[in-house]
Amino acid sequence: ACVQIFRFNNFTTSDDYQNDYGLSTTHWVTTFAKDVKPRTHPYQVVCPLPLNIPKYLKRYSYTNIRALRANLGTTKFIPVEYFEELLTLIPNPSTGISLLFWIWKETGSLDHDRVKGFTFFDKSQKHHYFDEHKACMHKGDLEKALYLKMINGDTTEILQP
């Protein structure tokens, strides 16, 4: 079986973190935010925001346009219809839940044992593994509820918001 490992934005795969999540990476997940450092390794680049659609590029004004343009031809973007469906469920989805929703829509399932590193913005957890507790604009409770429905295969309320 092919193992796909998605890492977000300014991830690190240093030996310090090897026991937590290993060193491999197959996909770089980025929204091309201004504070995201460019990568030179030839990862498959995926963007869980539809930044290839002008109205969404305008909505996410923090986008580094130069980096986006440099990667436009090689980046796979979330299909806009998936993102718009997600917006009916979660008004301001994180890139993490956007990616998981995208995978779920494409495959029809989501395996909890293969998803690592999501805290759903639990206030007792760090926002990211590398920083301090931060205020968050995302709705962790809604994201967690959607995640649980996806891993449990419960599509009744997901498909009928």
Regions found by a protein language model. Name each.
Residues 1-161:
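Metal-ion/cofactor- or nucleotide/acyl-coenzyme-handling active-site neighborhoods
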